[in-house]
Design a protein with these regions (language model features):
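A structural signal for short, well-ordered beta-strand segments
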Residues: 112-114, 135-137, 197-201
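Catalytic core of Fe(II)/2-oxoglutarate
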Residues: 131, 141-142, 146-206
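Short beta-strand segments enriched in hydrophobic/aromatic residues
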Residues: 23, 35, 139, 201-203
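Short catalytic/ligand-binding loop motif for oxyanion handling, primarily in non-cytosolic enzymes
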Residues: 26-29, 52, 121-124, 145, ...
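A short glycine-rich, His/Asp/Glu-containing loop-to-beta-strand
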Residues: 103-116
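Non-heme Fe(II)/2-oxoglutarate
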Residues: 2-100
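Conserved short histidine dyad/triad with adjacent acidic residue
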Residues: 114-128
């Protein structure tokens, strides 16, 4: 399957790398098959039920590692396809941006959260203090019908507009949030909002 990935590396205002066209067409089809399944009544959970910061977000999510355990991980298209995030060509590029990223290439642990933002949903700025590194992948249906949903970094006066099929990787200490999503005349379960797949990862062993 042909790849057309573009990478941009930044050391300021904090170390991060942005990939465009990260997944190929076949991988995207597999991801959307699972996202569409989750965007049905009673599936995505509120923050209090998925480990989110209750007083900071009203978005809904699922922690896939709690659902697909051990040998059942292969039942998830997303948990299969997102192994691409941990390819050496990806982690090696991130690891050389700054010394604080250098151990990313030796990561031996990760967990995956799928999140959906619809009209009026947001995530106030926060820091994932217990995580060494973060990778956010973004998806939305075309044509895009919502506004907002940018990944925001108020402390750094910086933002990322989260294009479809993009990925941003950064250290876990970077404070970040999501601006409020606005959609007119769209039912929640039609899935025309903003999806993100978050990979929390790092090193558990010396």
């Amino acid at each position: 399957m042909m790849e057309n990935i573009e990478a941009e590396v930044f050391s300021d205002p904090f170390p991060h790398v942005i990939f465009h066209n990260f997944y190929n067409r076949h991988e995207l089809d597999l991801i959307w098959e699972e996202l569409d399944f989750y965007t049905k009544p009673g599936k995505f959970l509120e923050a209090k039920d998925f480990g989110g910061v209750v007083d900071r977000t009203n978005s809904h999510a699922l922690l896939l590692d709690d659902i697909y355990v051990d040998k059942h991980r292969k039942l998830s298209n997303i948990l299969t396809v997102n192994r691409k995030v941990f390819d050496s060509s990806v982690l090696d590029l991130f690891s050389v941006i700054h010394d604080c990223c250098s151990i990313a290439k030796n990561s031996d642990w990760d967990c995956t959260k799928v999140r959906y933002y619809h009209d009026g949903e947001y995530y106030e700025p926060h820091t994932d203090r217990s995580m060494q590194f973060l990778a956010f992948s973004y998806f939305h249906k075309e044509p895009k019908v919502f506004s907002g949903g940018e990944l925001i970094f108020p402390k750094y006066n910086y933002s990322f507009d989260c294009p479809n099929n993009s990925l941003i990787m950064m250290p876990g200490w970077v404070e970040h949030g999501v601006s409020e999503v606005s959609i007119k005349d769209s039912d929640y379960f039609e899935g025309h909002g903003r999806y993100s797949i978050t990979s929390f990862f790092g090193n558990k062993h010396p």
